[in-house]
Amino acid sequence: MNVLVIGSGGREHALAWKLRQSPRVKQLFIAPGNAGTAQLGRNVDIKLSELDQLLNFARREAIDLTVVGPDDVLAAGIVDLFEAAGQDRKSVV
C-alpha cells in the first residue's frame, strides 16, 4: 500500500512513525514533512495550500491511503477535491 501523510508537525510525525511499522505499507510519503519524517519515508516538497498539486502527486504515485493531519487542510476541502477526482472517501482520512 502506498500512503501519503499530509502535514509537517508532530501529529504527522507520530502518524508516519506508526504507519511505517505496518508491513502493509510499501511506500510512505509525507507532504511537506519535516526532518523527523524524512527518516521514516520520503518528504515531498508540496505546500499544504497546494491542494491540486497534492492530488496530482497522489495520482502519479498511485496513493492508496491519504492521511490528513492539519485541520486547515481539511477545512480547505481536500477530501471533497479528492472525492471529485475519483478517490474513494475511505482512502482519504
PLM region spans:
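ATP-binding N-terminal substructure of ATP-dependent carboxylate-amine bond-forming enzymes
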Residues: 1-93
